[in-house]
């Protein structure tokens, strides 16, 4: 086997449709578009969501909800992520320095997911009840 003898398996490749190349091709003259009408024209067709003039679904259904702007700057931190932080004190800046949270994050909450291996001091972060118990069991403490 040589590079110049390699070829795709039989039937793996399909020849492209060659439109408008004579009556014998089966796709000559109208090129598979039929006769007349909007879709036979160049640039023909309707926009996405158009239902022929009927009130479209996206306008029939009511608007609902909103996106909380605070959610965009809030993040959850797993207990297992605390191991990535250098030092014993964990706060917003040390989490950002360790790339645990993004730089745009302003609020963080430590949640019970994974395990905390060493005693750490949590400063200025919110902590769930389960995470608080796990941190204190490991010898750490939480400062508000």
Curated annotation (Swiss-Prot):
GO biological process assignments: translation
Pfam short name (any one): Ribosomal_L27A
GO molecular function: rRNA binding; structural constituent of ribosome
Keyword Transferase among record annotations: no
Compositional bias ranges of the Gly residues kind: 21-31
SUPFAM superfamilies: Ribosomal proteins L15p and L18e
GO cellular component: cytosolic large ribosomal subunit
Domain of life: Bacteria
Functional note: Binds to the 23S rRNA.
Subunit structure: Part of the 50S ribosomal subunit.
HAMAP family: Ribosomal_uL15
UniProt record similarity statement: Belongs to the universal ribosomal protein uL15 family.
This protein's name: Large ribosomal subunit protein uL15
Species name: Pectobacterium atrosepticum (strain SCRI 1043 / ATCC BAA-672) (Erwinia carotovora subsp. atroseptica)
Species lineage: Bacteria, Pseudomonadati, Pseudomonadota, Gammaproteobacteria, Enterobacterales
Encoding gene (name): rplO
